[in-house]
Curated annotation (Swiss-Prot):
GO terms for biological process: D-alanine catabolic process. The gene is dadA2. It comes from Pseudomonas aeruginosa (strain ATCC 15692 / DSM 22644 / CIP 104116 / JCM 14847 / LMG 12228 / 1C / PRS 101 / PAO1). Keywords: FAD, Flavoprotein, Oxidoreductase. The keyword Transmembrane does not apply. This is D-amino acid dehydrogenase 2. FAD binds at residues 5-19. The lineage of its organism: Bacteria, Pseudomonadati, Pseudomonadota, Gammaproteobacteria, Pseudomonadales. Belongs to the DadA oxidoreductase family. GO terms for molecular function: D-amino-acid dehydrogenase activity.
Length: 416
């Protein structure tokens, strides 16, 4: 008889975990508070599958920059201090992670997981015929406005054999739509990819339904993880107990509400925003994915749409749209790609990205014998989802992991 796994949360990480587990022979129950999966942080994110450019937000240059950003209305990072111990714990952990040695170590952890994720998605596409989510291998160009930031990036390439330094003229030759922006150079990674994260969630949910080994409960909120000694028995949903041999917590930033006594998740939501523009024959949208490094804006051509995403707001738990931030994003995007799409028809969105202070997700055991975590991916949720799901399925199935798991669930990370 197949072992039963209950997964809390049907965003891209939860769905990818369910898919990996079903492929390994488990029976899965997926519980999602919304009416279907992929409607929260996975709905309209940046769309870039950025496997080799995975540097954590916690960087040695950020503390000094942040002091200047606090005084600017157009800053890519905004902090609104609150009387919230969780926010201050997270900020202190973030500052500690900005040390250069820790940043490099955490970037190495992320790169291992990202490359596994790329291989895993390729396996699923080739072996299972998974498609229908506007996937393309279109490459990525990280473009720089400031000579100093360009110089630092050239010195810290994650994979010099797969990344290429370009002059301003070479950037323009690669992507002619950049003609309106004063970039001084860029770093090109040809094998990066792009896709529609929400459509990917829909495809995974349909495949899981067709498998006969995944029960999906939508519009149902888990109110409690039920413990029993050194293990957990299952989850409580609407007063009913759903028993399981294993429980996976993948509910994004809301996961902290469900942690058991004595355990605390080092998570905080980083609010981000996106615009999605229709692209017609009269427009000049970039075909290559673009990251405007100095403004911290990403651009991704997803089918006949241009997705523009940006900003890190550490402002609490309100997921609502903020007109001033969206107006700033619209203005900066129009300055960079004035003919990039129909700005008047842009669809606005905001999402709450669950992040750890280090930027490295928590993928592994959650302090009880059969409680597992897959969360804290920050802005890299789509990029890391398939690899994280595969890695957790291997751990639950007691199989040798595909990569070294060092750093993915550090000792003491869950201390209450």
């Amino acid at each position: 008889m197949a072992q039963r796994v209950c997964i809390i949360g049907a965003g891209v990480v939860g769905l990818a975990t369910a898919y990996a587990l079903v492929r390994e022979g488990f029976d899965v129950t997926l519980v999602e508070a919304r009416e279907r999966g992929g409607l929260e942080t996975s709905y309209a994110n940046g769309g870039q599958l950025s496997y080799r450019y995975v540097a954590p937000l916690a960087d040695s240059g950020v503390p000094a920059q942040a002091l200047g950003w606090l005084l600017r209305n157009d800053a890519p990072l905004r902090l609104r201090p609150r009387l919230d111990p969780a926010q201050w714990r997270w900020l202190l952990g973030f500052l500690a992670a900005c040390r250069g040695s820790l940043n490099r170590r955490n970037a190495a952890h992320l790169l291992r997981l990202a490359l596994l994720s790329q291989r895993t998605l390729q396996d699923w596409r080739e072996e299972d015929g998974l498609d229908g989510f506007d996937w393309r291998r279109n490459g990525k160009l990280v473009a720089f406005r400031q000579p100093a930031s360009f110089a630092r990036a050239r010195q810290g390439l994650a994979d010099p054999s797969a990344q290429f330094v370009l002059t301003a003229a070479e950037c323009l030759a690669l992507e002619p739509a950049l003609s309106a922006a004063p970039f001084v150079g860029g770093i090109h990674t040809p094998d990066e990819e792009v896709a529609d994260c929400h459509a990917f969630c829909v495809q995974l949910a349909e495949r899981l339904q067709a498998s006969g080994h995944c029960r999906q409960l939508h519009g149902r909120r888990v109110t409690k993880i039920v413990e029993g000694g050194a293990a957990v028995r299952g989850v409580e949903v609407g007063g009913d107990l759903i028993e399981a041999d294993h429980v996976v917590l993948a509910a994004g930033y809301r996961s902290a509400e469900l942690m058991l006594p004595g355990l605390r998740l080092p998570l905080y939501p980083l609010k981000g925003y996106s615009l999605t523009l229709p692209v017609g024959a009269q427009h000049r949208a970039p075909d290559t994915s673009i990251t405007d490094y100095d403004r911290k804006i990403v651009y991704a051509r997803i089918g006949e749409r241009l997705r523009i995403a940006a900003m890190v707001d550490i402002v609490g738990f309100d997921p609502g749209l903020e007109p001033a931030r969206l107006a700033l994003l619209r203005q900066q995007a129009r300055d960079t790609f004035p003919q990039g799409g129909d700005f008047d028809a842009a669809v606005e969105w905001a999402g709450m990205r669950p992040a750890t202070p280090t930027g490295v997700p928590l993928v592994g055991n959650g302090g009880y014998r059969n409680l597992w975590l897959n969360l804290g991916h920050g802005a890299l949720g789509f990029t890391l989802a398939c690899g994280s799901g595969r890695l957790l399925a291997e751990q639950i199935g007691r199989r040798p992991p595909s990569i070294d798991t060092t750093g993915l669930l550090p000792r003491g990370a869950l201390a209450g």
